[in-house]
């Protein structure tokens, strides 16, 4: 069974969807995804990782594997609780719990930004903010996630998916 959760973040965090079966998730609307505020990227990542590791420690059966997809149109600029080194350490620790993180960044060098926090370039994707490239990026996420679940391989974006996410 695949469960889906969705957290929005800027200078604060808002959990929009928690543990809904993937087939029951309704499509998001464009207004759901409008950027606003500043970007407390590291705090959002750190709080999310902390939540899921805590849940796993309380109940070892709560998930077999977990994929966390980070999508941002801004660079880190307002986190107070976490920094790049603490996030990098947390992401390394995630491997003990079969937690994978994937980074999608608009209007930035997503591969460079992901590397700062320990996410491999295979799991990072640049995308342009057009309807076509955003749709392409999320289709790539779906395909990559399916490949991982099907054959047990590490998550990675294919070269063709990288090309399709750019104008």
Report each predicted region and the residues it spans:
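Acidic, low-complexity intrinsically disordered regions
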Residues: 1-167
